[in-house]
C-alpha cells in the first residue's frame, strides 16, 4: 500500500505490476538520457562563440535526427507491446468474480458459487478500529486465493466508475451496459487497497476497494462459511 511522503510506486504484488515497473524504469532511463543530451547541446550553444551562419543543409545531421528518434521509439514500443498483451491475456481463470459499481459502493458476486454475493461499503471514520485506515476500510472485503489466475468482470449500475488496485497493476473502467474484464494473479498474501479512479459524483472519494489475498485453503474455508 502507499505510505505518507512516498515518491515511488507501491510494491508489486502481481507479475503484471512487475512488468509495469520494469517498463517505467526502462522508459525513464531513455527520457533521462535524452534530457541530458538536450541540456548538453543547449549549454554548448550558450557558451560557444562559434556561429555557423553559412550552413543551409547538413545531410548527415538530418539523417541522425530522423533515424535516432525512430530507434528510440522502437525501444519504447517493443516492451510496451509485450506488457499490453500480457495485461490483456486471460489463461484459464480458476475463479470469476463480477464487480458492479454503484453510487457509492461496490458489489461483488462470485459466479462460481451459488448465492455468494455481497456489497462493500466504506467504514465511516467514527466506526474505525485501532490501526484501520481512514477512507480505505470496508465492511466486506473481496477475498481471493493467491497464486491462482482470477478473472474479474467489471461493470456499473449507474454512472462511470473505475475499479483500480495499484499494487496489482489493475485499473478497469466500470461502464453501464458494458462488461470489461481483467485478470489478476497475486504472488503473496496480504491486504491490498484501491479506490474508484473515475469521478462519479459527490461521494466519489468514498468508494474504497480492499482485496484480502489468502492461501487457497483459507479461501475455501471462507467461501464455505459464507455459503452456510
From Swiss-Prot:
User: What residue ranges carry the coiled-coil annotation?
Assistant: none
Stated EC number for the protein is 7.1.1.9
Q: Where does Mg(2+) bind?
A: 198
Tell me the keywords, alphabetical order.
Copper, Electron transport, Magnesium, Membrane, Metal-binding, Mitochondrion, Mitochondrion inner membrane, Phosphoprotein, Respiratory chain, Translocase, Transmembrane, Transmembrane helix, Transport
Identify residues that carry Phosphotyrosine. Answer: 218
Q: Which residues bind Cu cation A1?
A: 161, 196, 200, 207
Mind naming one GO cellular-component term on file for this protein? Answer: mitochondrial inner membrane
Amino acids binding Cu cation A2 = 196, 198, 200, 204
**Function description:** Component of the cytochrome c oxidase, the last enzyme in the mitochondrial electron transport chain which drives oxidative phosphorylation. The respiratory chain contains 3 multisubunit complexes succinate dehydrogenase (complex II, CII), ubiquinol-cytochrome c oxidoreductase (cytochrome b-c1 complex, complex III, CIII) and cytochrome c oxidase (complex IV, CIV), that cooperate to transfer electrons derived from NADH and succinate to molecular oxygen, creating an electrochemical gradient over the inner membrane that drives transmembrane transport and the ATP synthase.
Query: What's the name of the protein?
Result: Cytochrome c oxidase subunit 2
Amino acid at each position: 500500500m502507499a505510505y505518507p511522503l512516498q515518491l515511488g510506486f507501491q510494491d508489486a504484488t502481481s507479475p503484471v505490476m512487475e512488468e509495469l515497473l520494469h517498463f517505467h524504469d526502462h522508459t525513464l532511463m531513455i527520457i533521462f538520457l535524452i534530457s541530458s543530451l538536450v541540456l548538453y547541446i543547449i549549454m554548448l550553444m550558450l557558451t560557444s562563440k562559434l556561429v555557423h551562419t553559412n550552413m543551409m543543409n547538413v545531410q548527415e545531421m538530418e539523417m541522425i535526427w530522423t533515424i535516432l528518434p525512430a530507434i528510440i521509439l522502437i525501444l519504447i514500443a517493443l516492451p510496451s507491446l509485450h506488457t499490453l498483451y500480457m495485461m490483456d491475456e486471460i489463461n484459464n481463470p480458476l475463479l470469476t468474480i463480477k464487480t458492479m459499481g454503484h453510487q457509492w459502493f461496490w458489489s461483488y458476486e462470485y459466479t462460481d458459487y451459488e448465492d455468494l454475493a455481497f456489497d462493500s461499503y466504506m467504514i465511516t471514520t467514527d466506526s474505525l478500529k485501532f490501526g484501520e485506515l481512514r477512507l480505505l476500510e470496508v465492511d466486506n472485503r473481496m477475498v481471493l486465493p493467491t497464486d491462482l489466475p482470477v478473472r474479474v468482470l467489471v461493470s456499473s449500475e449507474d454512472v462511470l466508475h473505475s475499479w483500480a488496485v495499484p499494487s496489482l497493476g489493475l485499473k478497469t473502467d466500470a461502464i453501464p451496459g458494458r462488461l470489461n474484464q481483467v485478470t489478476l494473479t497475486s504472488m503473496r498474501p496480504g491486504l491490498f487497497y484501491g479506490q474508484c479512479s473515475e469521478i462519479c459524483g459527490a461521494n466519489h472519494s468514498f468508494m474504497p476497494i480492499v482485496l484480502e489475498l489468502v492461501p487457497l485453503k483459507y479461501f475455501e474455508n471462507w467461501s464455505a462459511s459464507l455459503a452456510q
